């Protein structure tokens, strides 16, 4: 199944890339546990890492600080390794409300969650690839340090089918039920199977467009074939197939029975403690809730909130780390921590927040003490589990620098010859009017501007002021969700507006070559938003444009400003020197605008059932208001056909969207007639 990593790129390493690749590979081969790649914005850090992976042929996990950057990295790695297994592993919750108890108001909040089926399929695909192949790159978020099913139990539960194998049809169906597959002879979808005579069709949980057909003759597997679940067309005939469980948390029956006995023992011990402390209500609550869960586990093999008993189900002792995605990574795997100055502190913070919430649940009798072991990894456990690691950042944190022993691989020269932005410091007193004149200069030559402020209030007031003066401006704030945020960034790049105002959102990983000016208001107010790293990251947003410039408005130069300006000057000098020595003229990046959103949409939206190919739907806004009645009628017929098509494919959400649009078009048609 595995193939060698094969890098697909029209470019060869250039600038600082060849030296960075050589040093990183030497370090890995010498057994260095930690290395840091200091790569400036736009220097091709992902390409450097892809070259290292391809040269060393090692399975790799890439950790990103959020889903947006993970999606961007996943898309880039997919392009670099089209023939290899590039997988995506992030939290599959679109919405998640953990269970919690607020003692002050005696309020218990039930767990509530909405799971994105497509991301669940991608997670299953990621672990399958890690177990089966060596040519695998998994792009993950911090979700990777949360508990996952034990890989040993997961492997034990697999169902292997081979042609010529002697097995009873009922035995196959029983095994599929144990893997949590559901029988559904009407709607054939991911994680289900259907039976027609001696033919069993199985839709693997980790697949989105291929299903398995098992043809039996008496008690022998006569033929195994892969087919398209939408058309029913046979794609290929195969000699063997492995069916993986529908979920990572599947457990063999004997393990569940053993776990139930251990849960009963813990319940008896905990009841004794609560009664000794005269906590009668808590004792009664805990007994009732746990007995209900045990009954469900006995009857169904699982219960709601079964993850709270994960310590017993995986056979771990108290306080032992939970199995995570790191347990699926081979021993010689490689870990790349992207934007490490953000990702590393995130990993450290996850355990403490989770622990505080669960201690309250245990104290007030909502959960057994063993629920505390259903948790993310502690930071020291992450350190112990992490294989050889490369930290990647334009502004590495103290932790990474300390771990790398101060020996940092510098990647400052960009292949395009682009220089770091010119930095100017201007007085605060006239900052708004000065900014307005700078914006007008940029808008006149079709370039974009980013403005970062210190407070929400100031961002709102500035946006209003710029609008009053005729500028096309938008305001980006924390209440905007990820998809809308991506759309705003796309609109900025497309020139729908010229100025984007934000607070702390215009930083890591945003790829906007059209931005030629970054303005930082109140740059001399020392603090988190104006620290050396924040300033360098924000200034870096203008580094992808030939005319890149950053204006820092401040009445004095703070230590953070001095360090940020000094570091930018150091990089700029090195870049200029390299360009002069090699006769390079800086070239602006001409990156397609669709790149940002196309991938995010594929991942963010649950793919349709069956074939799983979501079709683009025309938005109502895209229909011109002045269409003739004849054109409107034609449009209505088109959309009616598309709606019926979606309905036949059981894609009811898409069909409903078109139905709502048809109502609007019919109203327009009546008005126009």
From Swiss-Prot:
- Keyword Signal assigned to the entry: answer is no
Q: Which GO terms describe its cellular component?
A: cytoplasm; excinuclease repair complex
Mind listing the UniProt keywords for this protein, alphabetically? ATP-binding, Cytoplasm, DNA damage, DNA excision, DNA repair, Excision nuclease, Helicase, Hydrolase, Nucleotide-binding, SOS response
Listed binding positions for ATP are 39-46
Q: Where is the UVR domain?
A: 633-668
Q: Which GO terms describe its molecular function?
A: ATP binding; ATP hydrolysis activity; DNA binding; excinuclease ABC activity; helicase activity
- Motif Beta-hairpin: positions: 92-115
What top-level branch of life does the organism fall under? Bacteria
The primary location reported for this protein is cytoplasm
Q: Name one GO biological process term.
A: SOS response
Q: Where in the cell is it found?
A: Cytoplasm
InterPro entries given for it? Helicase/UvrB_N (IPR006935), Helicase_ATP-bd (IPR014001), Helicase_C-like (IPR001650), P-loop_NTPase (IPR027417), UVR_dom (IPR001943), UVR_dom_sf (IPR036876), UvrB (IPR004807), UvrB_inter (IPR041471)
Looking up CDD domains in the UniProt record yields: DEXHc_UvrB, SF2_C_UvrB
**What residue spans carry the region label Disordered?**
608-627
Q: Which HAMAP family match?
A: UvrB
The free-text function statement in the UniProt record for this protein reads: The UvrABC repair system catalyzes the recognition and processing of DNA lesions. A damage recognition complex composed of 2 UvrA and 2 UvrB subunits scans DNA for abnormalities. Upon binding of the UvrA(2)B(2) complex to a putative damaged site, the DNA wraps around one UvrB monomer. DNA wrap is dependent on ATP binding by UvrB and probably causes local melting of the DNA helix, facilitating insertion of UvrB beta-hairpin between the DNA strands. Then UvrB probes one DNA strand for the presence of a lesion.
How does this chain assemble? Forms a heterotetramer with UvrA during the search for lesions. Interacts with UvrC in an incision complex.
Q: What is known of its domains?
A: The beta-hairpin motif is involved in DNA binding.
Query: What family classification does the UniProt entry report for this protein?
Result: Belongs to the UvrB family.
| PANTHER family reported in the protein's UniProt record | UVRABC SYSTEM PROTEIN B
What's this protein's name? UvrABC system protein B
Which species is the source of this protein? Escherichia coli O7:K1 (strain IAI39 / ExPEC)
């Amino acid at each position: 199944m595995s193939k060698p990593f094969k890098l697909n790129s029209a470019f060869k390493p250039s600038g600082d890339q060849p030296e960075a690749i050589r040093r990183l590979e030497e370090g890995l081969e010498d057994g260095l546990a930690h290395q840091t790649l200091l790569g400036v914005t736009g220097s091709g850090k992902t390409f450097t890492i892809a070259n290292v992976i391809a040269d060393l042929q090692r399975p790799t996990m890439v950790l990103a600080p959020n889903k947006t950057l993970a999606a961007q990295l996943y898309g880039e790695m997919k392009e670099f390794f089209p023939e290899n297994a590039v997988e995506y592993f992030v939290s599959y919750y679109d919405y998640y409300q953990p269970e919690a108890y607020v003692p002050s108001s005696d309020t218990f909040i039930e767990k509530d969650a909405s799971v994105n089926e497509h991301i669940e399929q991608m997670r299953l695909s990621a672990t399958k690839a890690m177990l089966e192949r060596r040519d695998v790159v998994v792009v993950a978020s911090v979700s990777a340090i949360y508990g996952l099913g034990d890989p040993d139990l997961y492997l034990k539960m697999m169902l292997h089918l081979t042609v010529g194998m002697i097995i009873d049809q009922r035995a196959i169906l029983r095994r599929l039920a144990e893997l949590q597959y559901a029988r559904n002879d009407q709607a054939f979808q991911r994680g289900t199977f259907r039976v027609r005579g001696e033919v069993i069709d199985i839709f693997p949980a980790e697949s989105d467009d291929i299903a398995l057909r098992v043809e039996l003759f008496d008690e022998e597997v006569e033929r195994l074939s892969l087919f398209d679940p939408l058309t029913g067309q046979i794609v290929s005939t195969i000699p063997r197939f492995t069916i993986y469980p529908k979920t990572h948390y599947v457990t063999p029956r004997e393990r569940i029975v053993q776990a139930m006995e251990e849960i009963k023992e813990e319940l008896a011990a905990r009841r004794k403690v609560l009664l000794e402390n005269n906590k009668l209500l808590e004792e009664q609550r805990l007994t009732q809730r746990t007995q209900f869960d045990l009954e469900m586990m006995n009857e169904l093999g699982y219960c709601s909130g079964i993850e709270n008993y994960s310590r017993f189900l995986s056979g771990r002792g108290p306080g032992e780390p939970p199995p995570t995605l790191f347990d699926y990574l081979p021993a010689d795997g490689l870990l790349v921590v992207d934007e490490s100055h953000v990702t590393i502190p995130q990993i450290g913070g996850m355990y403490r927040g989770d622990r505080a919430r669960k201690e309250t649940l245990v104290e007030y009798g909502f959960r057994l003490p063993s629920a505390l072991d259903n948790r993310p990894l502690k930071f020291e456990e992450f350190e112990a589990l992490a294989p050889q690691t490369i930290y990647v950042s334009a502004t590495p944190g103290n932790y990474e620098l300390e771990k790398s022993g101060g020996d940092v691989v510098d990647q400052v020269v960009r292949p395009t010859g682009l220089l770091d932005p010119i930095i100017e410091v201007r007085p605060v007193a006239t900052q708004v009017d000065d900014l307005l004149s700078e914006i007008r200069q940029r808008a006149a030559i079709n370039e974009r501007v980013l403005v970062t402020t210190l407070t929400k209030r100031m961002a709102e007031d500035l946006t209003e002021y710029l609008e009053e003066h005729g500028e096309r401006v938008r305001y980006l704030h924390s209440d905007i969700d990820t998809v809308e945020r991506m759309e705003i960034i796309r609109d900025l790049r497309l020139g729908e507006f010229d100025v984007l105002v934000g607070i702390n959102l215009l930083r890591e990983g945003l790829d906007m070559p059209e931005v030629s000016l970054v303005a930082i208001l109140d740059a001399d107010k020392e603090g988190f938003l104006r620290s050396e790293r924040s300033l360098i990251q924000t200034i870096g947003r203008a580094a992808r444009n030939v005319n890149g410039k950053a204006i820092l408005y401040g009445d004095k130069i703070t230590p953070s400003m001095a360090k940020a300006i000094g570091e930018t000057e150091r990089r700029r000098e090195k870049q200029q020197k390299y360009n002069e020595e090699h006769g390079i003229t800086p070239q602006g990046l001409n990156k397609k605008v669709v790149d940002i959103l196309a991938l995010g949409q594929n991942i963010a939206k649950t793919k349709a059932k069956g074939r799983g190919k979501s079709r683009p739907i025309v938005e109502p806004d895209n229909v011109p208001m002045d269409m003739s009645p004849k054109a409107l009628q034609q449009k209505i017929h088109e959309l009616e056909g598309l709606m019926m098509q979606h309905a036949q494919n059981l894609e009811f959400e898409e069909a409903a969207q078109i139905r709502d649009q048809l109502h609007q078009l019919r109203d327009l048609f009546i008005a126009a007639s």
